[in-house]
Amino acid sequence: MTQVEFVKLKRPEKARHLCELAEQFFNDGNKILIIVDDKNQAVTLDRFMWTWHKGSFIPHAFNNGAVDCLDEPIIIEIAECNPHGAEILIMGRPCSFEFMSHFRHVIDFAEVYDQQLASDARQRYASYRKTGFAVAMR
């Protein structure tokens, strides 16, 4: 069964949390897929992951089709595809339930600093439970 965990964001710092979570899961020996909205977000996150924390190294690649990234433990992706068989999905944007069901562990964000984003997160939380996912707050 897919386990979905929500991370509460009190400030718009999703990129930092994406990096922290990716590093934690990587250090535990997992392959991770990070899904973002578009190429601009993917390139920005790719660059940020190299510099976000002094002394931190997170091996990753943006699957832009120009580089072979299948051996990387962390892949940044725009489309709902899992090219390296990751079991961990970190959602920088919402994904379909069908896609989420292919992962053991999914991270979503409750962006409580914004009323509309918080409402959207509550709706996703309820939908995940109704779908049969195991849902919790992280």
Question: Each predicted region: which residue ranges?
Answer:
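SF2 helicase motor core recognition
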Residues: 82-102
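Glycine-rich, aromatic-bearing surface loops/beta-hairpins
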Residues: 104-138
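Long, hydrophobic N-terminal alpha-helical segment
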Residues: 1-42
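Short, charged/polar "capping" segments at the starts of alpha-helices
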Residues: 40-44, 115-117
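Structural motif
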Residues: 10, 36-39, 91-94, 111-112
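Short, hydrophobic beta-strand segments that form beta-sheet elements in well-ordered domains
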Residues: 34, 74-77, 87-92
